[in-house]
Amino acid sequence: MARQPYRFPQARIPERGSGVFRLTVRNAMAHRDSEMKEECLREDLKFYFMSPCEKYRARRQIPWKLGLQILKIVMVTTQLVRFGLSNQLVVAFKEDNTVAFKHLFLKGYSGTDEDDYSCSVYTQEDAYESIFFAINQYHQLKDITLGTLGYGENEDNRIGLKVCKQHYKKGTMFPSNETLNIDNDVELDCVQLDLQDLSKKPPDWKNSSFFRLEFYRLLQVEISFHLKGIDLQTIHSRELPDCYVFQNTIIFDNKAHSGKIKIYFDSDAKIEECKDLNIFGSTQKNAQYVLVFDAFVIVICLASLILCTRSIVLALRLRKRFLNFFLEKYKRPVCDTDQWEFINGWYVLVIISDLMTIIGSILKMEIKAKNLTNYDLCSIFLGTSTLLVWVGVIRYLGYFQAYNVLILTMQASLPKVLRFCACAGMIYLGYTFCGWIVLGPYHDKFENLNTVAECLFSLVNGDDMFATFAQIQQKSILVWLFSRLYLYSFISLFIYMILSLFIALITDSYDTIKKFQQNGFPETDLQEFLKECSSKEEYQKESSAFLSCICCRRRKRSDDHLIPIS
């Protein structure tokens, strides 16, 4: 009898009204819904990582943010240049007046400072003459000055100058017998000389006991006075003039008691609002135009700040969608590298620059309105913001492969460079402290830590090598030999070894980036997920209009339809 072939039982087709049929349809719909959700997420991710030009070609979306950034660069740079020219006039006026004051009030001033002090005296007669010369010049100021200067009130609201002297309380000294008896308590005596006192004839103030100085006890004599001036050169730039208060101080320093009294001159200029300005012409109108321009810059920066903040918020929402989807489908979290891809550092840079530009523009408007006089703080904000704005241009250059190498090389080499600099910095600090303590008494460039650090840094760049070797004093043969060993070892170590290794780190990162560009970068989970997009484009084209409608309707029920715009 022939053996019949085995027949597999046929699957039972569920009837339309049965529960199995409804479950099958529900599973199919859930699968279809999951696929649509995945495709929508993949499409949003792909659009987010596009360049502005690619976004325009993909959806005809005008890159408003790119245009706004270009306009902001032009406006901020123009604002900085105008403020820089105005600030240059302020600095020049202060420096010129300081030089004029030194020639007016310092007897025998040659035009160049001897060191950190202006000049010096070596005899008692020269000391008395220098003190009396400064006082007499102050009295005759209006007759001898070439500038727009006048007398100002001091802290006591009195017009005049104040003379103070510091000296030890009491003591006797006999150097020939090597005998010293002194009380190291310091006394401070001051006298106020008004214009009326200085105008008396004969000038009896010179014969007062206050000016009988015992130089072996004297520590210093300080002459302080206030002057007022008006900067008229701003009118040529169609700006309102500034009124200045110069707080001048002349110090005769005898603390070393070395037979040399160093004379220091310090002038602290403060800008004050002029009480009564009557200027005819277009200067006032020009100031109003500048204020309107600054207000327009603030509006542009506010718009840029809002757009970048919005993009970061939407990027974080998109990141949350991707993390939840990845965890739900693949049952594992996304790596940290992929998570940081959603945090656009350029947006953070733009936000910081916008905030600094807004603050700097407000300060600049207050300065123009003569309600604020702090040019330095405004310069820091405007200068730093302009620096960040121009650095942000690199982001758009990075879309081109030829320019992107610089950005990728900096990103790849930065961690290694920072670790290397930390190690090299320890050696650098060691040389700094050693040079300061050993060579400080014998070399001008090693007198303090700040100067030593600057000197060593210039040696690394190859500057002033011969001058550094030649200026060492040869009073001590031991120190002279140590200086040669110190300088030769530092130059050899940092130029031929540390600096070469520093360059090698950057070169290695550059070579690695070039290989990756030729052979492809290692793909992360995010890149592999986006790579599937190209393989499913045909499916997206053949998808029904009903599914597209469902996808759009589902996205409208939440904030997922908001896609970050670059």
Curated annotation (Swiss-Prot):
Sequence intervals crossing the membrane: 66-86, 289-309, 347-367, 377-397, 420-440, 481-502
Intramembrane segments: 449-469
Major localization listed first in the record, in broad terms: membrane
Cytoplasmic side: 1-65, 310-346, 398-419, 503-566
Extracellular side: 87-288, 368-376, 441-448, 470-480
InterPro entries: MCLN_ECD, Mucolipin, PKD1_2_channel
Catalytic activity from the UniProt record: Ca(2+)(in) = Ca(2+)(out); Fe(2+)(in) = Fe(2+)(out)
GO MF term list: calcium channel activity; identical protein binding; iron ion transmembrane transporter activity; NAADP-sensitive calcium-release channel activity
Modulation of this protein's activity: Channel activity is reduced by low extracellular/lumenal pH level.
Region named Extracellular/lumenal pore loop: 107-123
Domain notes from UniProt: The most N-terminal extracellular/lumenal domain (referred to as I-II linker or polycystin-mucolipin domain) contributes to a structure with a four-fold rotational symmetry in a tetrameric assembly; the structure contains a central highly electronegative pore with a 14 A diameter. The pore is critical for Ca(2+) and pH regulation. The protruding structure formed by the I-II linkers may contain all the interaction sites with lipids and proteins in the endolysosomal lumen.
Protein family (similarity comment): Belongs to the transient receptor (TC 1.A.4) family. Polycystin subfamily. MCOLN2 sub-subfamily.
Subunit details: Forms homooligomeric complexes; probably tetrameric. Can heterooligomerize with MCOLN1; heteromeric assemblies have different channel properties as compared to the respective homooligomers and may be tissue-specific. Interacts with TMEM176A.
Official protein name in the record: Mucolipin-2
Taxonomic lineage of the native organism: Eukaryota, Metazoa, Chordata, Craniata, Vertebrata
